[in-house]
């Protein structure tokens, strides 16, 4: 059985070493870069390392053995994620992640130009991702196979973020559509969280076209399920357990499937209530409770749960048909369960 805790510790070690190396390098340039190095370390300190795990098991699914080179390559996915989170938190003005201040909120707390400094940090993290991946120690011929995939991963991730911003701003003009919400989820989360890390690992390992197609059949529905669960956590989750606000998505009128289903099922009076409350940056807990009650009452929350269950089933069916070592299959099955069952 796969020991994810032990795997996570190995990824954490790579990231701690990177933070140590970059602290020395940055402070060697100038002492005033200390806040940047400190926030870099904080940005890499937390996380479940799910994206790293998918790259690793994409590699192992090709029959390749465990090695330190692929651990370092997998750690690069966590740098991509940290960069994306840093920029996403700026866009959403989210103040908390993993129970601590986000980068721009931490810079602001120190009286610094928070948005500008956090943008620089996000760019730096993305740059480190490429460095860690290309210096992982795997053969150059293996790495060369993945070059097109890196461009694809970054393009799709930015496309998802861009579309989400556009559709959040369009909220005042018309109700969100479920299909559009899922499209954003596919680009912003499903591909860069599951499918593309699997493709990177599989391509590094020399996997067949059939295996990579199986990864898509498993990864896309699983990634959508992951985002749908995240949407539920973003509204119904306990901040003490999730480490982030359960008001931000409602305040920002995020174009989630949960909101789209709620609007579609709501009657005229409830739609007026939603128009009044959702998108209000001053929304408080009492108003949020009224929105949550409506989401429960109209069946939107249960519909999202059903969508998650259906997608997990599709992912499992695709995994069952894929040819790969038993250990890799077992690990990917376990990761699917983790993505689906994250606690509220």
Where are the model-predicted features located?
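Conserved N-terminal diphosphate/IPP-binding helix and adjacent helical/loop segment
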Residues: 1-82, 86-111, 162-179, 240-241, ...
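Short alpha-helical scaffolding segments that buttress acidic/His motifs in well-ordered protein cores
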Residues: 40, 44, 74-80, 150-157, ...
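Alpha-helical scaffolds flanking conserved acidic
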Residues: 53, 65-80, 144-149, 211-222
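Acidic, Mg2+-coordinating active-site segments of isoprenoid diphosphate-utilizing enzymes
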Residues: 57, 61, 86-109, 130, ...
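A glycine/threonine-rich phosphate-anchoring loop and its flanking beta-alpha core
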Residues: 112-113, 120-138
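A short glycine-threonine-serine/GTX helix/turn-capping micro-motif
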Residues: 116-118, 179-189
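Transmembrane helix-loop-helix
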Residues: 133-151, 274-275
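Short hairpin/turn module used for nucleic-acid contact or packing/dimerization
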Residues: 289-344
């Amino acid at each position: 059985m796969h020991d994810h805790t032990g795997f996570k510790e190995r990824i954490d070690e790579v990231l701690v070493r990177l933070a140590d190396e970059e602290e020395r390098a940055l402070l060697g340039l100038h002492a005033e870069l200390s806040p940047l190095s400190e926030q870099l370390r904080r940005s890499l300190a937390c996380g479940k390392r799910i994206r790293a795990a998918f790259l690793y098991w994409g590699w192992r699914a090709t029959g390749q053995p465990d090695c330190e080179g692929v651990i370092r390559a997998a750690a690069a996915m966590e740098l991509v994620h940290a960069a994306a989170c840093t920029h996403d938190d700026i866009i959403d003005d989210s103040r908390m992640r993993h129970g601590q201040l986000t980068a721009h909120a931490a810079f602001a707390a120190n009286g610094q130009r928070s948005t500008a400094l956090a943008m620089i940090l996000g760019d730096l993290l993305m740059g480190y991702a490429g460095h860690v991946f290309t210096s992982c120690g795997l053969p150059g011929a293996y790495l060369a196979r993945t070059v097109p995939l890196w461009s694809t991963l970054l393009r799709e991730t930015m496309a998802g973020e861009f579309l989400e911003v556009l559709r959040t701003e369009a909220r005042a003009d018309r109700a969100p559509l479920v299909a559009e919400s899922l499209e954003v989820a596919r680009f912003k989360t499903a591909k860069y969280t599951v499918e593309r890390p699997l493709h990177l690992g599989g391509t590094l390992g020399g996997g067949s076209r059939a295996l990579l197609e199986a990864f898509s059949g498993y990864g896309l529905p699983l990634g959508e399920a992951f985002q749908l669960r995240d949407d539920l956590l973003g509204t119904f989750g306990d901040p003490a357990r999730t480490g982030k606000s359960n008001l931000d998505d409602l305040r920002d009128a995020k174009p989630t499937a949960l909101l789209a289903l709620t609007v579609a099922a709501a009657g005229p009076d409830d739609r007026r209530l939603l128009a009044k409350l959702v998108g209000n940056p001053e929304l408080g807990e009492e108003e949020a409770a009224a929105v949550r009650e409506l989401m429960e009452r109209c069946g939107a929350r249960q519909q999202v749960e059903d969508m998650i269950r259906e997608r997990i089933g599709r992912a499992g069916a695709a995994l069952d048909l894929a040819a790969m070592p038993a250990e890799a299959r077992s690990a990917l099955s376990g990761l699917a369960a983790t993505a689906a069952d994250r606690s509220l």
